[in-house]
UniProtKB/Swiss-Prot annotation:
This is Ceramide glucosyltransferase. The gene is GCS1. A motif (D1) lies at residue 96. One of its GO terms (molecular function) is ceramide glucosyltransferase activity. A motif (D2) lies at residue 148. The keyword Flavoprotein does not apply. One of its GO terms (biological process) is glucosylceramide biosynthetic process. Pathway: Lipid metabolism; sphingolipid metabolism. The lineage of its organism: Eukaryota, Fungi, Dikarya, Basidiomycota, Agaricomycotina. It catalyses: an N-acylsphing-4-enine + UDP-alpha-D-glucose = a beta-D-glucosyl-(1<->1')-N-acylsphing-4-enine + UDP + H(+).
């Protein structure tokens, strides 16, 4: 065999193995979606606990302006089926446009313990971290649930999240008898924050809901509800590392307070900040907090059978591209190797090298093999999407199958050009502000957007 033939054979073997690995990850995400989400949610036992026995939860909603469907997203936490919680609505400007909406929601549900915190303090470039500082300090309970302003949840989500948080508790109690639940003893006056080896963060997979049918919004929805969800579930199923998107996160305030800052620039200070303030230099603070809980405190992560509904506003295709470019540029400074390999996990690229490898090693025409690969890929994506939508049917406008397929195809075709564009720079624009992402993953403010 010639040298070129040998190299071709080796290349075929390598690409076939890689193709199998990529498909294994995809099928793991699909399988997780089918097992965990493709059935009605089971009500949490915690919803029946007396107030004195239930672990208290402080729900924090950081707000900035009028986000999509804001009234309904805020109202969702006022209707939770859980006996003991408070809600904090946090803004940084007393003239914030979200405040009238907050007041309407609070007036409608006077029986819910809720308050507004307005504080303009700044501890870093991340406005969300700045907005959370005072609510963290003033929270009534140690158990915190941070829920983004664009997100809505079903009434049973909180109970199932708290139950997942305390899933380390050993018991021989019957799961069908709330009175025998070990969680009866996990009241605020006796429980302690999680320790190494226990669950220290609970999160949900986000599912996009799109009322404004612009093409950028539809492509974003297709991405979040298929590729992103599938990979998110697969990575979390392996439990090899933290993978948290941050739309909905529950953790202990005490645990957060014991985290050292991952920021090299802050660690170089004579008295570096700890706790939440130590994450101020990062735009992807949720991911960094998840990594710190995982690696520094050795705390596990858990997911429930709930999804968090992420309402997407009107996006142009350019808006969609800019959003994806921004987060790839942030991610490449945090996990460079994974970001460099990302194109190889996309449907079209993996289909091309997979079809070539099979043709080289086993014979066959490349085009039919590629088309078969793409047909299988879209089938897995649709099945994953349907499983995740099991408990949210009827929420959001009707969806056209043809429109979805067009948006899905556009997403797949744009994946490589977007990645290539993201590799050309380390500058991003977020909420009208330009930043440069440096090697540590920190963001440096460059000035106001022109």
């Amino acid at each position: 065999m010639s040298d070129s033939g040998t190299l071709s054979l080796i290349g075929g073997i390598v690409f076939l193995v890689l193709w199998v690995v990529v498909w294994s990850i995809c099928l793991l995400g699909w399988r997780t979606a089918r097992i965990r989400y493709a059935h009605p949610n089971i009500p949490s036992r915690l919803s029946k606990l007396p107030v004195s026995s239930a672990p208290g939860v402080t729900i924090i909603r950081p707000l900035c302006g009028l986000d999509q469907n804001l009234y309904n997203t805020l109202e969702s936490v006022m209707k939770l089926d859980y006996p003991k919680f408070e809600v904090i609505f946090a803004v940084q400007d007393e003239k914030d446009e979200a405040l009238p909406v907050v007041n309407m929601v609070m007036e409608k549900y006077p029986e819910v313990e809720a308050k507004v915190i307005i504080d303009s303090r700044k501890v870093g470039v991340n406005p969300k971290v700045n907005n959370l500082m005072t609510p963290f300090q003033e929270a009534k309970y140690d158990l915190l649930w941070i829920l983004d302003s664009t997100c809505s949840v079903l009434p049973g989500t909180l109970g199932r999240s708290v139950e997942a948080f305390f899933s380390n508790t050993s018991s021989t109690a019957s799961p069908y008898d709330p009175e025998s639940s070990p969680l009866l003893s996990i009241s605020d006056d006796v429980r302690k924050p999680p320790i190494a080896g226990e669950v220290g963060l609970v999160h949900q997979v986000p599912i996009a809901v799109c009322y404004q049918k612009t093409w950028g919004s539809l492509i974003e929805q297709a991405y979040l509800n298929t590729t992103h969800a599938k990979m998110y579930l697969a990575i979390n199923a392996t439990s090899i590392d933290s993978c948290v998107v941050g739309k909905s996160c529950m953790y202990s305030r005490d645990n957060i307070s014991h985290l050292t800052t991952p920021s090299p620039s802050l660690r170089s200070l004579p008295d570096p900040p700890s706790g939440l303030a130590g994450f101020g230099p990062f735009l992807a603070e949720d991911n960094m907090i998840g990594l710190s809980l995982w690696h520094e405190l050795k705390l596990k992560h858990a997911m429930t059978s709930d999804v968090v509904l992420d309402f997407i506003g009107s996006l142009s295709v350019r808006d969609y591209i800019n959003r994806r470019v921004r987060w790839i540029r942030v991610r490449k400074k945090m996990t460079l190797a994974a970001t460099l390999l990302e194109p190889l996990t996309e449907s079209i690229i993996s289909g091309l090298y997979g079809a070539w490898a099979i043709s080289r090693l086993l014979g066959g025409n490349i085009l039919p093999l590629f088309l078969l690969h793409m047909a299988a890929w879209i089938s897995v994506d649709i099945s994953t999407k349907r499983a995740l939508e099991t408990n949210i049917k009827g929420i959001g406008p009707p969806e056209s199958k043809v429109t979805f397929l067009m948006a899905w195809a556009a997403r797949e075709c744009l994946a490589l050009p977007i990645w290539m564009l993201a590799m050309t720079s380390s500058e991003v624009v977020w909420r009208g502000q330009k930043y440069k992402i440096i090697a540590s993953g920190e963001a440096i403010r460059l000035g106001d957007r022109n």
